[in-house]
Structure formats: structure tokens, C-alpha cells
């Protein structure tokens, strides 16, 4: 029997991304499994009522579309896959909406592509929307927008999308529910000596050799995609669990600390990982100058930069670009992701958030740079 207090990683996780595979959602392609989806939704509701925030990344649109269209074999033509995704997405989202509503929880459909997360402005827009939904106690149900993006159907997988969403919202953990118990040292269907891996470091090169290429004929991803997804999620400090989706009360038991499935532990803390990524990969586009009070709040207080504390804007930058924050002497004190373009920043400089709608024509974030997107300069 597992020690229920033996795994603090999931027990302490407050923001969780759950990814469930198509073979589970559609009962191996035989149509949406209403009982299983209902059980997951019941668990999601319990987690939210426990004060956690949860995002569901669900495969199954293409598989459900195939069932509705009477196709037994997954087609190879892109336009047929897109058609199946369009047909299946209707039923998939309706099922989640119904089952979550039965448990008193609201839901929202969010369709993303990798391109949405590669563009800085769209990245921030998606992040803001998802964080707002979480604050409202709503479960975002996310899928790839297979209907319009060719190479996502051809090359993408929802394991990767789950990891990207974990990066996007700075999740504490990614739970990948699959039709396998977890990771073994070899394929247990071929090697009777294969040993189960209870815990390992995310990104360990040896894991990829263990994973092999086994996967479902209904979905796109095998165990190797899950290992790579865990590595990607660890880049923003999120640990990953790969577990059997039919395990009774799996989500509840995991968040109570029970050791179910394979735990792949991130080696970097969430905040450190995100800020290191910003420092390494994003180019400086401009700067803002701030008054002594704002400088102190950013440097000493660890607070967000508010427009009312800005005294000047330099350069030409867009929302999502990296800008420098300079004190009254022109010395850089921090860098961060701008919530407003340089043109907008000039309009709201020295203004309070209640004035933004009149000045900009809309109400956006109250911060010029949120504290989670700020890196103090040395």
C-alpha cells in the first residue's frame, strides 16, 4: 500500500493541467465514454472546491468525429482529418460542459495552435484569458484547433499541447492520463522483465530510451511524446505524472499525495525557470523610466510595475515584448514583458487604471509589467 503522504509534489500543487488521451475519452474509438468523462469531471469539481485551479486538455475530437462519420480507420488525408475534428469537437465539448455542469462547475472551450503560443502578443492574450477563467472557477477545456491547422494534425499531439499550456499558465503540475499504467524500463508487452518506473527526473536522457514508440491507433502520441512533454513542462518548473486514466479516483488520490503512475520531477522552481527562459530567449525592445517610489516597489517590494509610476517611455515595442525598467538616473533595475505597446504606454503613463478605458478605448491589465513577468537586474 502506498504512503498517502509520500508524494508532496502533487499534494502541494495549486494549479494543475490535466491531459487525457483520445483512447480513454472515446473508449478505444467506440464513441465518447460518458461514464469516464463524468468521473473525471466529478474529480475536477472536487479539486476546484478544494481551492485548486484546473485546466483540462482533452484529445478525442478526431476520434469522436470518426465514430460519428462511421469511419473505422483513421484517414490519412488532411482534409478528412479536419472534417472529422470539426464533427467530433461538437460532441466532445458538449459532453464536458454537461458533466461539469452536473457538478456545479462552469466550463469554457479554448482551441489553440502552437502558433498561438509562439507569438508573444497572442501568448499573453491566451494567458490572460485562461487565468481569468481560472479565477472565475471555470474549467477551460482545451484542444488543438485541428480543423484549421494542417501540420498540427500531421505532426502535433496533445501531450505537447498540455506541456505548453502548463508553461503558459505556470502550472505546478501536469497530469497525463493515458491507457498505460506509466513508464516501464522496457515495453512490458514485449519484455516480461520490464520494471515499472515510479519516479525519475524530468529530462533524464535515459527516459527516452525506455519510452520506445508504443501508442494507440486511435490517437497520435505514444509514451515517448509524454516523456518529451514532461521535459518541456519542467522547463517552467512543472512536474509531470503519467498515470492510467481508468485508475479509480486517480486525480483525487494524486492530489492527496498518493504515488500513482510515474512521477517525473522538475528540477527547477517554477518562478526561476520562467524568468530564466525570459532572460535567455527574449530580445530587449524598449524601456520605461519610473519614479523612485515605483523603483522601490519593484526592487524591494517585489511588486508589479504600474503605469502611474512611469515617467517616460523609450523605443517602439509591442504588447508581449521585453522592456527594460529604468530608475530616474537611467539605470536599469529590471526587465519584463510589457502588457501594453509603447504607443499605449505613452497614453497611460502617470495614469491610474480607472482612466485606461477612456484613454485606450478598452480596459486591459492594471499593470504595465506584472511581477511574475519581471526579472530584477543585477
From Swiss-Prot:
SMART domains: PUA. Gene3D superfamilies: Acetylglutamate kinase-like, PUA domain. It is an enzyme of class 2 (transferase). One of its GO terms (cellular component) is cytosol. InterPro entries: AceGlu_kinase-like_sf (IPR036393), Asp/Glu/Uridylate_kinase (IPR001048), G5K_ProB (IPR041739), Glu/AcGlu_kinase (IPR001057), Glu_5kinase (IPR011529), Glu_5kinase/COase_Synthase (IPR005715), Glutamate_5-kinase_CS (IPR019797), PUA (IPR002478). Residues 285-363 form the PUA domain. Its main location: cytoplasm. Catalyzes the transfer of a phosphate group to glutamate to form L-glutamate 5-phosphate. NCBIfam families: proB (TIGR01027). This is Glutamate 5-kinase. It comes from Polaromonas naphthalenivorans (strain CJ2).
